[in-house]
Amino acid sequence: MAKDQYPVSDTQSPAKERYFSTFQLILLALFAALVVVAKIALRLPLQLPGHSGIFWMAIMIVAAGVVPKVGATSLVGITSGLIAAFLGMGDFGALNTFLSYTMVGVGTDLALLLLGRKPENLVIAAIAAMFGHFCKFLVKWGMGVLTGAPVGFVALGLARAMIGYVVFGALGGLLGALTLQSLHRAGFFSYLAEKK
């Protein structure tokens, strides 16, 4: 049969639009890398459980504002978890590291979904970040219980560790919301709209 004998449709099926654009995926990958870099480079000499959440959660909230779609922070969490596990970060192995980072993103996404997806709002950002960071605590505690590994924050007391994760998560959320507000004032989002 010759090529000419196959009928060609006049109406091509419309291309299915992807949920995240390539540009948005690149931004989310950069935020994921920034989470890992922040964990390595930005260390506070506080010796308190959960204190790194002030940086993590700020980055997660900014990611949720820059790519305002459900699943954005989950993707940042999964990607940063893969990077961190590959680099051998974390105290209790690759699985614990991957799940911890992933649950930060998933918990933040879930909280933002329930609270109305307004990460630039100080209260919403603080609550969402607090919940996301508390999910990390739950993973670490749960994995410690399941594996019987000595979990450092258990020695400090479970209540103190929980308070640390909640407080530093909320502070990170406030920092992220303030960063988003500054980006709005600077005109970053009108610039970003041109790039989509």
Spans of features found by a protein language model:
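N-terminal juxtamembrane cytosolic/stromal segments of multi-pass membrane proteins
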Residues: 1-20, 184-196
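Short helix-perturbing small/polar motifs within transmembrane alpha-helices
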Residues: 2-4, 15, 26-30, 99-141, ...
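Hydrophobic transmembrane alpha-helices
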Residues: 10-66, 71
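Residue-level signature of transmembrane alpha-helical entry/exit and packing/kink sites
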Residues: 20-31, 53-57, 73, 97, ...
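Aromatic-anchored segments of alpha-helical transmembrane domains
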Residues: 32-41, 79-87, 129-139
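Interfacial aromatic-anchored transmembrane helix boundaries in multi-pass membrane proteins
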Residues: 39-49, 80-110, 144-145
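Membrane-helix interface "capping/anchor" motifs
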Residues: 63-76, 114-122
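Membrane-embedded alpha-helical hairpins and interfacial helices in multi-pass inner-membrane proteins
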Residues: 117-196
